[in-house]
Amino acid sequence: GVGLVGSEMCIRDRVKGVSENIRVRSIVGRFLEHMRVYCFGVDDEREVYLSSADWMDRNLFRRVEACFPVRDVVLAKRVYREAITNYLNDNTQAWELTSDGSYRKFKGRGKPHTAQGALMMELTEHA
């Protein structure tokens, strides 16, 4: 499947025959800004990119932005863990896009996990 985390998605997920394997979530938390991390592929074939902007018309054609690959394997795994895995596992501040375009509170299972809280804890431990 495909997991997307963002606040302005121009996609309808879970549409039969089109996007049934796509899930879109939005995290409404302490921080307004979100990471611009793009991953393509799986496991050892995964390519990780960082960007200064989201991929919208206004950013791609009217501004100077940068998007670059993370070539260091260790760093790419860390970015994937902190940005993608962490945010897709958020089950307290996540909202999920429905096929009709509306959002509903995501009801995750297991121990409560807040992506932004976990990230702050991890980064302050290493400060």
Where are these regions (language model features)?
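Extended hydrophobic/aromatic segments used for targeting, binding, or gating
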Residues: 12-29, 52
